[in-house]
Every structure is written in C-alpha cells, then in structure tokens.
Amino acid sequence: LGINVGALIGHSAVRLYVMGEDSQKREATDDEIKQMVEIVEMAMKHGALGVSSSYVDVDENFDPVPSRFSCIKEKMALAKAATITGRGVWQVVPYFIDMETQLKNIQELGDISLETGIMCTFQPVLSTPDAPKAERIMEALQKERDRGAKVFGQTMPRCFDLNMRLSETSMLLFGMPTWKSIM
C-alpha cells in the first residue's frame, strides 16, 4: 500500500514570496500577479495538484493570512495557471464563521470554476447533516453545479471535534470581534 499524498501550492506562501510584507496589506499589482502565475505554472509542471487558499485563516498575530487580501483578478489568474497541465484544483477554507459570507465564497468559487475550468473544493463543511446550515450549503453547491461550475464541499465522516488552548491562535476565536484586542 503506497502513501496517498498530493502537494498543493500555498496561495499565501506565493503571495508572501512575491510581495513580502505587502502581501498582508493590499491587493497585488498586475506585475505581481504575473510573477505569481509563473510560480504556479512552474509548480504545476513539477507535479503540484493545484492551489490552496483561504477566506478565513489568520496568522500567529491574528492578522488575516496573505490570501485573504487577494482580489478576484488574482484568484482567476492563479486558478487559470493551475489548469495548464490539464489537471488542477482550487482548494479553499471558506469563511465558515458566518453563513452569508460562506455562501458568497461558494458563489465566488463557482465564478472561478466557470471562468477558468478548474475544479473548486472547500473544506470543511461544518455542520450536522440535519442542520439548516448544511441544507443551505448543499443548495448553494447545487446552484453552482446547475450553472455548470465544478464546486464541491468536503467534510469528515465523523463528528467535528476541536481541541483549543487559549494560549494559541484559533480561527474560531478570531470570529469573535473582541478577541484580538483581549489577546
């Protein structure tokens, strides 16, 4: 039995490499997007499976990670670059803290898929199977597939459990408006 591993290109890592500290301050310029596209194309030619990005993650200082500062133009360009080998996936962590924002993330993934032809996935779909939240997510996914987009949610085959320490960064705590100022 072999190891089942595939490498994804980190959107935040590519932004940080190209833009330095500005990657967590602003949108990329056209030249910076071009540089990022070249990196993604090179990685895909060397065996990467696609790009990973995030709508929700924060760094050790509770600041949004670089990918959260990207505009749709950048996302489209990198997703398109990830398809040059005939394969490619755009994998994201949605902003699962807020349902309406998460639904907008799903629609944006649909737009990216339709524009570039890439398959988009997001994980986690956090909910119980009978919860209204899960139903809304499934409806949003179906709506995107009805438009012709390749957008799929992923989840675990078991209950989601979370071990947290107040001394460490937690995306869930970031969703609480006063948490950053307290820490």
Question: Where do the model's predicted regions map?
Answer:
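Polyanionic/metal-chelating signatures
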Residues: 1, 12-14, 22-31, 39, ...
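Catalytic pocket of metal/acid-base enzymes, prominently hydrolases
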Residues: 1-92
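Active-site-proximal beta-strand/loop segments in catalytic clefts of secreted hydrolases
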Residues: 54, 93-95, 123-125
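Phosphate/oxyanion-binding active-site loops and adjacent basic polyanion-contact surfaces
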Residues: 71, 101-102
